[in-house]
């Protein structure tokens, strides 16, 4: 009778799904109110004028308009604003 000893178990072999984070609309683009601008973990980008922040730190447009990325303040924070059209 042919026998094969059982192989050992591995502690690898898992992976999480990608979270699709990042900038979704870039500077100069036109966006509708409610449109997502940035998906992020933490505040890599901070909300500026006419931009809201969700509880998962997603930045979204509060009004229709054009997106502007700027660096502001003493701490050189990257901010995103929407200029109403």
UniProtKB/Swiss-Prot annotation:
Name a single GO cellular component: cytosolic large ribosomal subunit
Record region (Disordered): 1-24
Identify the keywords attached in UniProt to this record, alphabetized: Ribonucleoprotein, Ribosomal protein
Q: Which residues form the signal peptide?
A: none
Q: Determine if Iron-sulfur is one of this entry's keywords.
A: no
Q: Which GO terms describe its molecular function?
A: structural constituent of ribosome
Q: Name one GO biological process term.
A: translation
Q: Which family does it belong to?
A: Belongs to the bacterial ribosomal protein bL27 family.
Q: Mind telling me which NCBIfam families this protein's record contains?
A: L27
What name does the UniProt record give this protein?
Large ribosomal subunit protein bL27
Gene that produces this protein: rpmA
């Amino acid at each position: 009778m042919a026998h094969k000893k059982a192989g050992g178990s591995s502690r690898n072999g898992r992976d999480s799904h990608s979270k699709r984070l990042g900038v979704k609309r870039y500077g100069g683009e036109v966006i509708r109110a409610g449109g997502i601008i940035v998906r992020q973990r933490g505040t890599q980008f901070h909300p500026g004028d006419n931009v809201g922040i969700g509880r998962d730190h997603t930045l979204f447009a509060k009004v229709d308009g054009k997106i502007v990325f700027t660096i502001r303040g003493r701490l050189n924070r990257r901010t995103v604003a929407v200029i109403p059209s």
